[in-house]
């Protein structure tokens, strides 16, 4: 699922390359999905939370389509817990916002505001700058 036709085309190529079946490509907004409530056992959102206009609305929509007790996995950049890096992110966030990216998104605040319990956090990617976050949907 993506809004970008180019990203959907890339997904189609990967589906073909890996011979995947039972995979649908859907063009829609992750903050307003057409799926019924409780449609999925697990929802994975990679590199989305920091580029949507309203991260809270996005998380609420993910919770809506994930069944109670289901897993929600975020792979995203979140504001650093290192005070020096966090300050740099705060100072540069205006520039990043102009490019459509929020460098100052706080993981703990986002999850708390949306009543998501974090089960596990792992640092991933280059220099561990991104995080893989596993939550349980306790709606």
Summary of predicted features, one role per range:
Residues 26, 44, 73:
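Conserved Rossmann-like nucleotide-binding pocket used by diverse enzymes
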Residues 132-139:
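C-terminal lobe and adjacent flexible extensions of AdoMet/dcAdoMet transferase-like proteins
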Residues 41-54:
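A short SAM/SAH-binding and catalytic strip from SAM-dependent methyltransferases
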Residues 56-68:
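A short glycine-rich, Lys/Arg-flanked "PGG" loop and its adjoining helix->strand segment in the class I
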Residues 28-43:
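A short acidic, Gly/Pro-enriched loop at the edge of an enzyme's catalytic core
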Residues 1-32:
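Class I SAM-dependent methyltransferase SAM/SAH-binding core
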Residues 6, 53-57:
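Short N-terminal helix/helix-N-cap motif within the alpha/beta-hydrolase-1
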Residues 73-130:
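C-terminal alpha-helical "lid/dimerization" subdomain adjacent to the S-adenosyl-L-methionine
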């Amino acid at each position: 699922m993506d809004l970008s036709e180019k990203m959907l085309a890339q997904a189609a190529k990967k589906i073909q390359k890996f011979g995947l079946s039972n995979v649908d490509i859907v063009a829609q907004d992750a903050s307003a999905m057409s799926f019924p409530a409780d449609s999925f056992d697990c929802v994975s959102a990679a590199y989305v939370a920091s580029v949507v206009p309203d991260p809270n609305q996005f998380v609420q929509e993910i919770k809506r389509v994930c069944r109670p007790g289901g897993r929600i996995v975020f792979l995203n950049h979140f504001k650093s817990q290192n005070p020096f890096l966090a300050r740099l992110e705060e100072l540069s966030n205006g520039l990043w916002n102009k490019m459509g990216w929020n460098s100052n998104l706080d993981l703990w605040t986002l999850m708390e505001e949306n009543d998501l319990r974090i089960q596990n956090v792992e640092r991933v990617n280059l220099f561990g700058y991104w995080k893989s976050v596993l939550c349980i949907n306790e709606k």
